[in-house]
Amino acid sequence: NNMVAGDFSNYDGTLHSEILWRILDIIEEHYNFEKDYRKEDAIVRRCLWESTINAFHLCGDELYKVDHSQPSGNPATAILNSIYNSIACRYVFYESGLTDFSSKISMIAYGDDNILSLRNDVKDLFDQDVITRGFARIGMTYTDEEKTGRKYNYKQLHECFFLQRGFSFNKMINIWTGPLKLRSILECFNWIKETTNEYEVIEGNARMAFAELALHDEKIFKNNTAQIKQALVNVYGQKPVSFTQTQYLMWLRDGHLTMKVPELNWA
C-alpha cells in the first residue's frame, strides 16, 4: 500500500558527472572479480567512459566538450541509466536524513523509470513529495510515472505502472499479473516490417495481443479480441486462432504461456 512510481523529465540532460564516475567504480568492482583482470583493460574502460560522459561534440565549426550526460547511441544507455537511477534515489534518501535504504525501501529501476515500496515507518518521511523535492535540489525533475503532474504521497500497487505495465491481482489464478497498457497492445497492428507474407506477421501479432489482453478484465478481452478477429477477416479473409481467457490465465499460472504463445517477447 506504500508505493511510489516515477519518471524524470529531461533525464539525460540532468545527469551529474560525479554520479556517472561513481558508476564506473561500480563497474570496475565487477571486473575485479575476473581471473583475467588487467590494469591495462581498466585504463581502456576509463578512457571509453570519459569519452562517453565527457564527449566531444562538433556543431558547425564549434567544438565543445560536455561535462555530464551521454551521447546518443551509447550501447550501455539502459544499464548506465538504471544504475544512475538507483544511486540518485539513495542519495536523495540519505540527504533526507534517513538511514539504511536497503532495509526500508524496495526499489526496481530500469532506465529513468522506477518503482519503490516504502516500509511503514518511513512512508511519511520519504514519500513522493519528499522524493520530488529532493531530486529538485540536485537539478532533476521527478514526476509520476504517467507524467500527469498529479501530486500524491504514496499509492497502492494496483494504481502503479512500470514499463507500461500495471499491477493487478487475478483472483482466478491467485497471483499478481502485469497487464500491458491497452494502447501498447493494439499498437502492434499499426505497422509491420516489409514481408512477403503479411498475414503471417499480422497473425503472430494477433496471437501476442490475445495473450496480453487476457491479463485485462473480461470485457476488455472479449471486445478487443472480437474486433481484431473481425478486422483480419475483413482484410485477409482469415480468422486467427485464439483461446479462452481462462486458458491463457491457466498457462500463465503454470508457467507455460510463453511456450504456448512464442510471439510474446517476455524476458
What is each PLM-predicted segment?
Residues Y64, H68-P71, P75, D121-E146, ...:
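Active-site and adjacent loop segments of nucleotide-processing enzymes
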Residues N2-Y110, L116-L125, E159:
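Conserved polymerase palm-domain catalytic core
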